[in-house]
Each structure stands twice: as C-alpha cells, then as structure tokens.
Amino acid sequence: MVLSYKKEFSFDQRKTETTKIKKDYPDRLPIICEKSNTQVNAPNISKRKYLVPTDMTIGQFIFSIRPKISITKDQALFLLVDDSFIPSTSSMMLQIYQDYCHADGYLYITYMIESTFG
C-alpha cells in the first residue's frame, strides 16, 4: 500500500519544500495527485508530484496525467479537489489552487476511475 503524501512527510517538510518551489518557480503551482482512498483496485499513478503552469486548465492536467495511470480508453478519469469537489475541465488550475490550497502550500488532488461502458 502506498502511503499518502501527507502521511509520508511531516507538515514542516512539505511546507519547506513548497516554499522553495514557489521561490524557484513563481509561475508554477505545486500539486500532489494520488488515487482516492475509495479506489482500492485502481492503479497507482507513476508520479504524484507536479509543477503546473498557472494558466493550465483541469482538462489539460487530466490529459497530462492520464498516461501516467495504467487505464484503458473505456475508463473515465475523474479528479477531486479537497476530496469533495469535482472541478469542471475548463476550470483554471490557478483558481482551484487559490481556493483549495492546503496550509502546507500544495494543492491535493485525488483521482477516481470509472468504467464508461458498465
């Protein structure tokens, strides 16, 4: 079982890391993307830390992470922010980050996979 990023690293470690990231890459947003706890059988993502441009949309982010998850074309990928909010694909990452950023400086996104053909 893969530990969640919040459990694997202390708050201080995460805060220190995002502070450095924001200093070095002011035009990027630090994001952690992990599978939802409810998706026991879903494949793990091969990379969970991302630095995305502020002008990226959720749809573009989905397009960029889909190859990093071993799913078939008949499976839909859904993202949840703050484990409760499903943003529209046209939502801007900067706005989502500003609204839902954790105190440690990361935006935490979880993904769920659903079969589109039953």
Please report, for each region that a protein language model flagged, where it lies by residue.
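Ubiquitin system architectures
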Residues: 1-118
